[in-house]
Structures are given as structure tokens and as C-alpha cells.
Amino acid sequence: MTRTLPAGLTVTARVPASSANLGPGFDSLGMALGIYDEIEVRTTDSGLTIRVEGEGADDVPWGPSHLVVRAIERGLEHAGVWADGLDVVCRNVIPHSRGLGSSASAVVGGLAAGCALAAKLDESLATAADELVQLASEFEGHPDNAAASVLGGIVVSWTETSAEAQAEVPDHGRVYRAVRLDPHPTLRPVVLIPEVRSSTAHTRGLLPESVPHGDAAFNVSRAALAVVALTTRPDLLMPATADRLHQAQRAPALPLTTRWIDRLRAAGIPATVSGAGPTVLALGTGEFPAELRALAAEEGLRVVEPGLAEGVLVD
């Protein structure tokens, strides 16, 4: 039986951005970044009100189709509760359509807020992190960004479609899993964010249906090396961020991104496409060179040093 939440319950979720792939770890490796959206939710007697501030305020729907609202309602449904009304405020800082996991952050924040409201009614309804990863990944279709925003740090994620997995989540048929890795303490991510946007669906459409065995073997070795480089051996980040499966294939759609990745790597700075782009992710341990920062600004890229982040927090 579905239980109804009383009016007046309030929660606030603070959810980080994320960068996926990290070079060779296509749809598997992810990293939480210290750029945050905030979602405030209050239960009311009836209806839905939503206000969006900041990034994307003029582009997203202010109604029940808003991704955050859908995620809140899914979180409530998962916990077996309902609210007669909701007042939702989204304060957005994460750039949209830039390869920084803004949709995953919206989903994770909404789910976490919905589940936290249920836990205020009954602590036994609290949702575990692995459940949040599953629920958020069902929205996204893959777990790399979602898992990073849930767990924080660096994540390795994967999808199971076995008969056992299908029995575990019969309504979805896929089990999404992730483990968190603690990044090396000297790791300093830098993101170079262009003004232009990129469509994940479009850039995914540029990928071939199959790849040569040699390229697959190359990426397996580099993805394994990336786990080592990101956690214990940052001196190996240059070879560990090399890729043959997706970046070159997407290059025609991301000329500015590709030029900057080549420029940074030529300067000895490990760099990759952040997610589907167009943001560039640089992974180093020292100061980002001032001359490159100035050149990036001249070419319309915003340079941000966000730091690594912990996962979603709810008050």
C-alpha cells in the first residue's frame, strides 16, 4: 500500500558533475567533479510548482516532464510513497550538453531527494547507494556518469544482462553496478568548456558498429592501466588516457575539442574528451600552464579547475 507523505517535508540535494570515459574506459570509467547543482524539494498539499535558476533555465520544461521531477517521482515510487504536491527549486551550475553529465546529475539529485523524503517518513525506507546507481542508470541507459555522481571519486561501472540479472530487476532486465576508487591525492582535473554544445545522441551515432580486434585489445590494456594511473601512478596518465574506440571517430563533430586534446598532449598534459564532448578533460598533477589558459580564453573556452568530488549529499 502506497503511503502519502505529509506536507512540509523539505530536503536539499547537492549533486556533482561528472566526466565519463576518461579516455579508454568507454561507458565504464567515470569521475565526479566539483561543479554542483542543487535541488530543493518540499512536499505540499497539492499540485506541482517548479522553478529553475541558472544553467538551462530557459531551455528546460518547467513542469511534470522536467527530468528532476520525473526522477523525484521515481524515487518516491521506489520507496512506496507518494506526495500530493511538490515544490521544486533547481539551482543549476553544471553546463548543459557539454559532456559533464548534467542529465545524470539531474537524475541522481532528483532520485536522491525523492528517496530522502521517503526516509523522513520512515527511516527503514532509506535507499542504499547501489540502489541509486541502478535507478539512475535505468534513466541514463549506462552507469558511468550516474555512478560517479552517486559514489563520488572515480568509478568503474558495468552492466549485467544475464538470466540472474534479469531476475533481479525483471522490469528492466539489466543490472547496473559500480565500484568507487579513491583517486591519487595529487590528481588535479581541469576542464576546458567551449561555448558550443554537443548532442550525445549525435556523437554516439558516429561510432561504428564494430571495431578491429587490435583496437579493442589496445583499449582493454589502456583502461586497465587507467585504473592504476588514476589511483596510484599518475606518472602513467599519458599512456593510460589513450583511446582508439571513440575519440577519433567523433573528431569530425568536435574540431575544437580535438585540436585542444592534441595541443595539450603535445605539451605533455594527458587530455581526453569529457563524455561525448565538447568539453576537454585534462588530468595532471601540477599547475595548468598560464599560457595555455590564456590561449583557451582567446579561443572561447572556459578553463575550470573543479577538483574531485564526493557523491550526492542530501540534507
UniProtKB/Swiss-Prot annotation:
The gene is thrB. GO terms for molecular function: ATP binding; homoserine kinase activity. Its EC number is 2.7.1.39. Coiled coil: none annotated. This is Homoserine kinase. Pathway: Amino-acid biosynthesis; L-threonine biosynthesis; L-threonine from L-aspartate: step 4/5. It comes from Nocardia farcinica (strain IFM 10152). It is found in: Cytoplasm. SUPFAM superfamilies: GHMP Kinase, C-terminal domain, Ribosomal protein S5 domain 2-like.
